[in-house]
């Protein structure tokens, strides 16, 4: 328990007002008359009193520095300036470039102190707010206006939505302060050109922990509040009106409530009335600093002029009442299980040191047993952690296996999509074959394979990751994130008319840090593993359904392959039919040749004179025609054998025909001597030549059609062969993949069953271990209680032994004196 440190500072008087009526002597301030005679009723003593010549540096060194150092060590701290308007509060807290105020000096001193502490690491967060017309505004984030005050069981009183900046050096904080000062409300009155129209609170949250063994040490969290209050004012003096008048009303109201709170807290009687913290936003925020867990200092500033005497007296009365308030400041620590275990070890060592030198071997043995049990407990914890990590690793392997199954299913989907594409391609090809002329359109590009459109992976196999990680927020948590938070209006309704004892309200009981039972944490592990096994079973069911659908698609693909095979057989039959056309033409030419020979024989039999020109002409024509028919047979045989192309067949036939025609013409010219025979021969020759030309053209056109049809059929046959080969490969791949999926499914089922069995065994082992651990912990507590009882009994016996020894000694002395007196 310690009292609030209170100091009074007198600002220098204005040049036109003359000397000050307040006299400062050591730590006492008194009011003197104009003749320099003191007024006995106007004298006050405080922890520190600073006269007109004091500087901000001296105020900080004597008043605030110890609180700043305590805040670095883990204590809550608060410093604020109180007084009337124009008395120097803002100058004391903010200062100037040549003489920085308490806020800037505190910021620099905090970081200097941190650099001197090498065995701990620190994290500092700052926020800057103002209370303007009973509304809380964030000076670091202009958009955060009209913030609300809430209370949490662990955090205590806090402002929801207030922005907090994590800082690393003093310069960064000073820049934030300068940016916040720009957003603060100032105004001009008759008493002050630059008057503060709002209360400002600059807050630093300092967290620290040890560097050597951070996992086994407690975390210290302290809050440092540096408050610059707006000054109380009288309307008659300030001449305020309009907005300034409204601001002055809210300022005077909050300061009046602050005075009431100080008055209630300074009452020394046991039965104190209800303390109205909730009547004002200012007192609600400063509740821990006023009669709570904090080291607090108040700087009361007064004006030395004669016309401000009444306001100065009121300020001194406020300071006198505040001086009687006591706080119970303690280090704020967050204890982990490791830190609690470390402290228990230290307590055991202290008990061991106390028992040294006494006859307590049994107790020493018990302490040793407790230490061994504690060691076993630590080893058991490590073993459980190792098993948990092993289970997590196995779970990760199962997830990887499931992902591999997903990839394989994606590949099967791609194969099925490719097969569907090929089936559509085959259907388009069959339709394109059935043109009105019965021929294929070779210029049609619809059968050209394109890039297949693969299906996207099924979303049912995608495992959603839980992002449990959340970085450090820039703002305090909002009220909806805290389940046990009551808002300000609810607290106001609950506390109206309520009268409570200050001893019950003033102090916050220390919450004991009890270790969380491990059974609660560990019994959730089998449930979680069971849910994971159920999830795996559902995924296996999905894989089975997908496999069935793939089997159906595979059957469809087999049916499509059979249809393609039937189409291929029809195409082969048509190809054989086309290949038989040259044979038929060759047979027709042979028949024509035989008929022609019969006609020639008949004509020769009709000619009696074999030496006549007609006989000679008939003989030459017979030779030429026979040669022509033989040439046609040779060309057809070449076409059937596929030894020549179309271009190599046309030119030899036409050249040979031209040669035969020239030979026929020469023969007729030599053989025909008379004009009548010549005319008859020419007429018959011209008719035969025209007939032969027509036959030649007809044969050429038929030959061209046959070649085109043959080439088209060859192309169709090649394309059908390619489609058939692709279908066979796809069919074989699908069969292999289905077989592989069945094997993978069976292996996955075996793995899941094995994992389930292992999880059950591990869960049973964990339950047994936890039961043993609880038994050991209970036994350890019982032993500690026995040690305490034995220590108390030992101390009692020791006291009785000492008293008995002193009594015997006194009796011995009496006997000695009696013996010496006896003659």
Curated annotation (Swiss-Prot):
Gene Ontology molecular function: any one: microtubule binding
InterPro entries hit by this protein: Kinesin-like_fam (IPR027640), Kinesin_motor_CS (IPR019821), Kinesin_motor_dom (IPR001752), Kinesin_motor_dom_sf (IPR036961), P-loop_NTPase (IPR027417)
Keywords linked to the UniProt accession: ATP-binding, Coiled coil, Microtubule, Motor protein, Nucleotide-binding
PROSITE patterns per UniProt: KINESIN_MOTOR_1 (PS00411), KINESIN_MOTOR_2 (PS50067)
Pfam families per the UniProt record, alphabetical: Kinesin
Domain of life: Eukaryota
Keyword Protein transport attached: no
Keyword set includes Membrane: no
Residue intervals of the Kinesin motor domain: 3-325
Gene Ontology cellular-component terms listed: microtubule
Binding residue positions for ATP: 83-90
Cystine pairings recorded for this chain: none
Coiled coil: 341-414, 527-557, 696-786
GO biological process: microtubule-based movement
Stated family: Belongs to the TRAFAC class myosin-kinesin ATPase superfamily. Kinesin family. KIN-7 subfamily.
Annotated protein name in UniProt: Kinesin-like protein KIN-7N
Organism: Arabidopsis thaliana
Gene that this polypeptide is encoded by: KIN7N
């Amino acid at each position: 328990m310690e009292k609030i440190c209170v100091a009074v500072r007198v600002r220098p008087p204005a040049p036109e007002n003359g000397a000050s009526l307040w006299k400062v002597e050591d730590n006492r301030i008194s009011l003197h008359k104009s003749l320099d005679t003191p007024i006995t009723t106007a004298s006050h003593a405080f922890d520190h009193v600073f006269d007109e010549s004091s500087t901000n540096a001296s105020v900080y060194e004597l008043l605030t520095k110890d609180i700043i150092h305590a805040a670095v060590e883990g204590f809550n701290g608060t410093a604020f300036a109180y007084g009337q308007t124009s008395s120097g509060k803002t100058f004391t807290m903010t200062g100037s470039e040549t003489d920085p105020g308490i806020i800037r000096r505190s910021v620099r001193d905090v970081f200097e102190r941190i650099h001197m502490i090498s065995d701990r690491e620190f994290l500092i967060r700052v926020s800057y707010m103002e209370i303007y017309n009973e509304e809380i505004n964030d000076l670091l984030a202009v958009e955060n206006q009209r913030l609300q005050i809430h209370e949490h069981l662990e955090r205590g009183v806090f402002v929801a939505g207030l922005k907090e900046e994590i800082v690393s050096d003093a310069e960064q904080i000073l820049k934030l302060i300068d940016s916040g000062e720009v957003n603060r409300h100032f105004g001009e009155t008759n008493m002050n050109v630059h008057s503060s129209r709002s209360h400002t609170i600059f807050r630093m949250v300092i967290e620290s922990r040890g560097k050597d063994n951070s996992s086994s040490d407690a975390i210290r969290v302290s809050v440092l509040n540096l408050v610059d209050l707006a000054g109380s004012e009288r309307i008659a003096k300030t001449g305020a009106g309009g907005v300034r008048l409204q601001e002055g009303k809210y300022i005077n109201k909050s300061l009046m409530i602050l005075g009431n709170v100080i008055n209630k807290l300074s009452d020394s009687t046991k039965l104190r009335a209800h303390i109205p913290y909730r009547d004002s936003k200012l007192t609600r925020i400063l509740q821990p600093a006023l009669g709570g867990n904090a080291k607090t200092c108040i700087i009361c500033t007064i004006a030395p002029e004669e016309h401000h005497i009444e306001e100065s007296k009121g300020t001194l009365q406020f300071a006198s009442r505040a001086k009687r308030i006591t706080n119970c400041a303690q280090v704020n620590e967050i204890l982990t299980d490791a830190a609690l275990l470390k402290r228990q070890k230290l307590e055991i060592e202290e008990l061991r040191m106390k028992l040294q030198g006494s006859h307590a071997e049994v107790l020493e043995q018990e302490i040793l047993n407790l230490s061994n049990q504690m060691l076993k407990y630590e080893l058991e914890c490590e073993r459980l952690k190792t098993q948990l990590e092993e289970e997590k690793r196995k779970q990760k392997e199962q997830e990887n296996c499931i992902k591999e199954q997903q990839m394989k299913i994606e590949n099967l989907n791609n194969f099925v999509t490719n097969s569907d594409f090929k089936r559509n391609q085959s259907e388009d090809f069959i339709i394109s074959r059935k043109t009105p002329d019965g021929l294929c359109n070779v210029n049609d590009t619809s059968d050209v394979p394109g890039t297949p459109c693969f299906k996207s992976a099924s979303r049912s196999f995608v495992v959603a990751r839980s992002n449990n990680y959340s970085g450090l927020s820039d703002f305090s948590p909002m009220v909806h994130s805290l389940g046990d938070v009551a808002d300000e209006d609810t607290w106001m309704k609950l506390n109206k008319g309520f009268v409570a004892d200050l001893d019950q309200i003033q102090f916050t009981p220390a919450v004991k840090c009890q270790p969380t039972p491990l059974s609660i944490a560990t019994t959730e592990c089998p449930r979680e593993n069971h849910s994971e096994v159920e999830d795996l079973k559902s995924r296996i069911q999905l894989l089975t359904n997908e496999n069935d659908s793939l089997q159906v698609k595979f059957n469809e693909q087999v049916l499509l392959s059979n249809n393609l095979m039937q189409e291929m057989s029809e195409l082969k039959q048509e190809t054989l039919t086309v290949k038989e056309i040259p044979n038929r033409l060759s047979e027709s030419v042979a028949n024509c040749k035989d008929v022609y020979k019969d006609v020639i024989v008949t004509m020769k039999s009709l000619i009696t004179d074999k030496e006549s020109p007609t006989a000679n002409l008939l003989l030459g024509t017979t030779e030429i025609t026979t040669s022509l028919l033989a040439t046609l047979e040779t060309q057809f045989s070449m076409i059937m054998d596929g030894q020549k192309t179309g271009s190599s067949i046309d030119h030899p036939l036409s050249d040979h025909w031209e040669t035969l025609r020239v030979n026929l013409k020469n023969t007729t010219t030599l053989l025909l001597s008379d004009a009548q025979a010549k005319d008859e021969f020419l007429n018959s020759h011209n008719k035969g030549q025209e007939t032969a030309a027509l036959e030649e053209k007809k044969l050429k056109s038929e030959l061209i059609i046959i070649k085109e049809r043959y080439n088209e059929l060859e192309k169709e046959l090649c394309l059908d062969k390619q489609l058939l080969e692709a279908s066979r490969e796809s069919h074989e791949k699908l069969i292999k993949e289905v077989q592989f999926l069945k094997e993978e499914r069976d292996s996955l089922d075996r793995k899941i069953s094995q994992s389930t069995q292992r999880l059950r065994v591990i869960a049973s082992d964990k339950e047994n271990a936890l039961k043993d651990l609880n038994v050991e912990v209970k036994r350890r507590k019982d032993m500690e209680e026995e040690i305490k009882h034995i220590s108390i009994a030992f101390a009692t016996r020791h006291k009785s032994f000492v008293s008995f020894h002193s009594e015997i000694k006194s009796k011995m002395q009496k006997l000695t004196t009696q013996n010496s007196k006896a003659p």
